[in-house]
Amino acid sequence: MSEQENNEYPIIVIGDKQYLMDYSDITGLEWKEIKKLTGLNAMEAIGQASMLDFDALGAIVFIIAKREDKNVKLNDILANLNINSVKTQEELDGEIPKA
């Protein structure tokens, strides 16, 4: 994926971690878990997350975060998720995180 394409996706900041909200590489099993957590199918979850439904956004971030840390908890993500967690690449100084 090019750097310009990465700039199109929001980045969610939770503590000292950054998660690129690129839905294109979320697997079927991951979407199944998101549906189990939220009751929403993939398109509904994406739509709700884009409207800052924190249950949907938190579930997606949780799934992405689990790729790096199998011990991460959904409630820990939700407890640290707020409006200011949603950033663009221009707002951040560092590299674009990998999904």
PLM features: residue spans?
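Charged interaction scaffolds used for protein-protein
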Residues: M1-L20, D25-F62, K66-A99
